[in-house]
Amino acid sequence: MASGRRAPRTGLLELRAGTGAGAGGERWQRVLVSLAEDALTVSPADGEPGPEPGAVREPEPAQINGAAEPGAAPPQLPEALLLQRRRVTVRKADAGGLGISIKGGRENKMPILISKIFKGLAADQTEALFVGDAILSVNGEDLSSATHDEAVQALKKTGKEVVLEVKYMKEVSPYFKNSAGGTSVGWDSPPASPLQRQPSSPGPQTRNLSEAKHVPLKMAYVSRRCTPSDPEHRYLEICSADGQDTIFLRAKDEASARSWAGAIQAQINALLPWVKDELQALLAASSPAGSQDIKQIGWLTEQLPSGGTAPTLALLTEKELLLYGGLPQTREALSRPARTAPLIATRLVHSGPSKGSVPYDAELSFALRTGTRHGVDTHLFSVESPQELAAWTRQLVDGCHRAAEGVQEVSTACTWNGRPCNLSVHIDKGFTLWAAEPGAARAVLLRQPFEKLQMSSDDGASLLFLDFGGAEGEIQLDLHSCPKTMVFIIHSFLSAKVTRLGLLA
């Protein structure tokens, strides 16, 4: 696989750093974005995060526990505190991390020093840590000769309870009295689950970036259509395959956003053969009776009933459409999709704009309906480009036809005129009703080819109506469960037969 050492593209963009006060008070930080073969790196650039035009600038978080307002003297600590090592236990909340920034490191010939403590977060709540404290160890791990990066990693990999051994460094504390820099170690990753958001929300908020952030491009999700409230079309969202790393960027104009999205997607696409090979191997290992070929894989943006959206990883095999919240990395994860749609009972009902009221991005959307024993499941998805829409449309239609040709025949128990029967539907032989009374001979009660079928319908509960014309007219079959699966299979057989005859392009 690509090494990621070459950076084919770099440039300055803005990173969404949170929300500020006032209307439209989103805060953006200027960052340097580097696109390599297998990762996207976002690093701080010159300039502080700023609010949207017209918004009220938020004050900087106050440095507490002795780090006073700009120009103030460093904290006055008891003399005994200056002479001893201290052990402080920090209990992290679910969000916010430790709530400190650090400076120093072996490469700077300095100890690891607390340069900022954020008000209200875990470190602040101990009331026992101070700006100017040197961190000597973390949970027993010695940091006395650690580099800056080693210290950051040691702090990040801690659990809910962190034991810090510290010592106050009086001689260096004045250096931090006006400091707003340092490395924040409070970046907590979101949970690995589908990122759901409402139409008014542009996505998960990111805290101020003070160190490089790397997003792996292997099966990453990229979207320029993450929010309808983007009149200038400048927004860009990138999410790692497992949902752990998400960044939300803003380009200078629509052309720049389109260019960056295309370049990032091209790098992701270059890694697809490796992803497909890995998943194919997992699929073969989890299906000892014979594996299915993966026909298509990619991210879709699903329109949720609530009005929001969620990135959904779709994997199309010869028989099924499998939907996941993230990239499955194990056989167990691959065998447990969030949803499964058997292609033989699935129908593409529209691709592109539909009639009537349509949701955001309808021009790049498609809808699927699947017949199940509980009724009809309907899902609406959107993609990022006309090329993606065409590819998914073609693969889904072809997949439904392949599934129909592969299955050939389905059967189900039913009742006809009060008599127990079995209904068999064959793609070539048509419809056959067999007697199913206990002990009775397997007699054929009715046989009709597909060509005689004039109409089919159902009541959505248990009844299937088939009209073959002639003397029989319409027959009514009670399938004893929701008939939608059989209705959709009949449609797939018909569609496959029509396509086989070359009546559709």
From Swiss-Prot:
All residue ranges annotated as the SU domain in the record: 449-505
Comp. bias intervals (Polar residues): 195-209
Location of Phosphoserine modifications: 101, 184, 189, 193, 200
Ranges of residues in domain PH: 6-269, 293-401
Region: Disordered, residue numbers: 1-24, 40-75, 183-212
Entry comment on modification after translation: Phosphorylated by CaM-kinase II. Phosphorylation may inhibit the interaction with DMD.
Region feature (Calmodulin-binding): 483-505
A GO-annotated cellular component: dystrophin-associated glycoprotein complex
Gene3D superfamilies reported for this sequence: 2.30.42.10, Pleckstrin-homology domain (PH domain)/Phosphotyrosine-binding domain (PTB) (2.30.29.30)
Record protein name field: Alpha-1-syntrophin
UniProt domain comment: The PH 1 domain mediates the oligomerization in a calcium dependent manner, and the association with the phosphatidylinositol 4,5-bisphosphate.
